[in-house]
Amino acid sequence: GAAVLVVAGLAGTGVAAATTLAEPRHVFRDVVLPPFDVHQYASPLQSYRGYVKDHRKDTLFTVKGLPEGARIRVGTMDAYNGVVYDVSDKGVGSSGAFSPIRDNMSAGATGSAATLDVTMDAYTGVWLPDAGAVSRITFGGSDADALRRGTYYNDSTGTAIATSKLRKGDTYSVDTTIPRTWTDKQLDGLA
């Protein structure tokens, strides 16, 4: 009995040593990134009351280059679950479909070209203030590389998210196309 156990143990050790590779094991999960999931981040509306109540007199961020009448967008929500507004996850074209930033986003946009220079102050979080149909986002400062690698854009809604979070002092430039706006008088009678 004991001799059989010794032989089996030696055989098992020999097989294990012969089949163990000298090189480390490579698996896809080490190199393939999971898809971006916007639902990991709180809706920008969840912070809205805090900004209105606690930062009423504070400068949240500064934008230079914004054309007159253009609006800053922090997020675009198209779903409501009875408690909170959020982005939907209805696939391509939905407000939950984000992809990594790149040059030449929103290539077919029409309107007036503008370059916005944005500096963060009291505003912090993942939702990136922008305007219009963004074609390029360029970060500055010591966190520029981390912000660039962790920023995603939704071309359908014009919304951007920086997963490494914006902080006071962060700066970025946005090349964008501001769409034409219409007055009520211009639209009257067109329906």
Q: What is each model feature region?
A:
Residues G1-A191:
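Helix-boundary/low-complexity linker signature
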